[in-house]
């Protein structure tokens, strides 16, 4: 391979792994030393053979290994910003949110796998959103909450009503208007402008990508109603990750925004209600490194779950059941820092919507069932959040949906009929921007993205460097949601 100019393509080599010494330093949380070891390896001279026996057949080094090291270096640089709370700080954060929380309780939760943590420079640190996982998914912690709990009853009632309508009428539709935007945070912009002036420039050169609704089977009558300023490019309606793109030289900070509307239609499908064709298609059944990979652990799990089963619909149902009944919802760090997502999900039995979707997709593909990614926003009255889900294909019916995280949520709520609903069907409260995982933008973003795999809130590149974390400021809002 030749090293791609798009740094996000380097992630396809992530599974090349780390040298043993760097791997041990990473596991122990000594990130600065690990970065130093990586830098030393990247600087090695490969023009001469290590054993002095003639010309080296790889005079520039092993390109896949070099790409993996460059990605791992950036992962190591970003990890400390994901795991920010010492144990004492984590206890104090929980004590401010629930009654009677103790250090012993935190450590018990760590041992049980309910609190995500890592070592950072030798000190145990908890994930920045660990408290949200506990309060949002564990009724015992919700009952100890200080102050009123969010009302989930109305949302559950809407899901029941939507399910009933879809069963009765075969589909449900909604007309939706969303406004969204992204830009640099003020602090990041001021720092970038100061660097530019120190280099003799008067402005920060910005490139911005904002997700837009894409043309797909469920989305129609898409209207791009307003932009804060004309985009330099709007990607094709059927782009795998559709965006509006701006490029500008800024002397003062500003956000780039869009308002759009569309009709979303969710058809009802029961994958077990028809007889599958004896021969199924082979598209969307391959591996896509670094995450959709047929590891021995996943092959073994898929074989166990489908033992004695020949129907592709029943195989897919068993994968869905395994995930929705076993994988506990956990907020995740940035996907940038995650490795081997489906294997970790299947073994650790925890993850968020995207983690569960990737696990379902990979298990389906191992079993020869076409499966693919879809993502964007989950929208509704007063609601607009990021969301991912999966699609799978069984002839003669065609593409159907699997929303494993919603299914797991319904399992926790004791709503078995709704859990089954999300195997085959979803709901119209969606905005689909991405129809493929790990797809390039149009035009491509060459620097590291905040998320090299998905695009839900947008990406910003300043003076050639991709921004992430608190360097960007994004918003999204559902302006109207009308059931049709």
Regions found by a protein language model. Give the residues of each.
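Alpha-helical solenoid scaffolds that mediate protein-protein interactions
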Residues: 41-42
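Acidic low-complexity segments
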Residues: 18-19, 26-30, 35, 236-245, ...
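Low-complexity, Gly/Ser/Thr/Pro-rich intrinsically disordered linker/tail segments
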Residues: 426-484
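TPR-adjacent "capping" and linker segments in tetratricopeptide-repeat scaffold/adaptor proteins
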Residues: 3-17
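Hydrophobic/aromatic-rich core segments of domains that either
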Residues: 16-20, 24-28, 355-445
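Intrinsically disordered, low-complexity N-terminal segments that are enriched in acidic
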Residues: 27, 47-50, 60-267
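Active-site nucleophilic cysteine motif
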Residues: 312-319, 348-364
